[in-house]
Amino acid sequence: MSSSASYWAGKARQFRAHVTARVGVDERARLIEWLSPPQLALFDSMHVADRRHGLDVVATLRADGVTDDEILLAGLLHDAGKGHTGVWPRVAYSLGQAFGPWVWRIASYIPGWRDALRRLMDHAETSAVLAGEAGCPARTVELIRHQDAPIDPVAGRALQLADEAN
């Protein structure tokens, strides 16, 4: 029961974080020193909740001692492929992960949700492609592509743990 309660508490925290997400002007300004113009444009194109999440993942990675810019860049941009998917399709997607694909089948009847759910399902690959197009290093692209099932046992797992923590 406690694992179920902690799961739902985590989902409630994610929901609250999504609807209250903000990125400060100073946070955005610091990225100018770190990102190339195409990478910054990709960051700016992301939903504000995904930008906030990316910044939080980077902060967690740094707190864990990660200094490798390729890993940090993957943490920042790993959800770029989610686009501007709203909160309710994201809730349906999470419910589908927890209870099975029948949730997605039902939710896909809601106008616009089929595409939104597909974006969420495919976001790792889409994010990797977008990162590559923005000039990210090949290693960053691969870390993003394999974010859910890391093939790099150190960097990939660090990214996955930081993502899950946020």
What residue ranges belong to the model's regions?
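Non-catalytic interface/linker regions that flank or bridge core catalytic/transmembrane domains
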Residues: 1-42, 148-151, 166
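Divalent metal-dependent catalytic cores for phosphoryl transfer on phosphate-bearing substrates
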Residues: 32, 37-166
